[in-house]
Design a protein with these regions (language model features):
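Flexible, P/S/T/G-rich "lid" or insertion loops adjacent to the active sites of thioester-utilizing
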Residues: 221-224
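Structured secondary-structure scaffolds
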Residues: 1-219
């Protein structure tokens, strides 16, 4: 695991739980109860912890007794995502049985682009906190490329408008094509002409079978 600068100079996000003093001392608050205990302002555990509300909470500096103020930064959203196994259960403060039953996960599934994102942040945080991986298996779905195997890009002019495909061929044709054209873990070379084949050979066959059945079913008054 490499060094990770988890702070972000943004407004929205999980506030970085660090208070600083003009004397240079820093304090990291580890829980709501600790913040309630140390807060100069009268607050309780129902306090809203997001900005701007948390920025109005100050604590006394244990070094010089001056007022400490929270830094304005928030935490990298990937840290939030990587904390999912613990955060969703508010572990270790509660739901320990639920956590123990579900951790580690049997598998996680995401796109190949999450290798340095969610896959990494999950395993980095879990290994640090729990000493083991948060998942047993990783299922990866690869990227959708153009028919020549090149990345789709507006500058190349090889992008495909899904809504145009829906209108022309139908959503079910597009769904079925993406399911069968290649394994989910390999790149998909998207070929618009192949949609026509799916529409005629697969859905067209189903439609013809139904039409054949309904023709004679109606003639013989069959009620399936």
């Amino acid at each position: 695991v490499n060094d990770w600068a988890i702070s972000r100079s943004r407004y929205w996000g999980t506030p970085l739980n660090i208070w600083t003093c003009s004397c240079g001392h820093k304090e990291s608050i580890g829980s709501i109860s600790e913040l309630v205990e140390k807060s100069i302002e009268p607050i309780d555990e129902s306090i809203e912890l997001h900005r701007p509300y948390v920025d109005d909470i100050h604590i006394n500096c244990p070094k010089c007794n001056e007022q400490m103020t929270r830094v304005k930064d928030v935490i990298d959203c990937w840290f939030d995502s990587g904390s999912m196994p613990f955060a969703q259960h508010h572990y270790p403060f509660e739901n320990k049985e639920n956590f123990d039953e579900l951790f580690p996960a049997d598998f996680i599934c995401e796109g190949i682009d999450q290798t340095r994102g969610w896959f990494y942040s999950l395993i980095a945080i879990s290994t640090f906190v729990m000493g083991k991986s948060p998942y047993k298996n990783v299922l990866v779905n690869d990227l959708i490329l153009d028919k020549d195997g090149k990345k789709m890009s507006k500058s190349r002019g090889n992008t495909v408008d899904p809504f145009e495909m829906f209108d022309k061929y139908g959503a079910d044709v597009l769904r079925w094509y993406l399911l069968y054209v290649s394994p989910a873990w390999t790149p998909t070379k998207f070929d618009v002409d192949a949609l026509k084949e799916v529409q005629s050979k697969f859905f067209g066959t189903i439609k013809n079978v139904y039409n054949f059945f309904s023709l004679y079913a109606n003639t013989d008054n069959i009620d399936p």
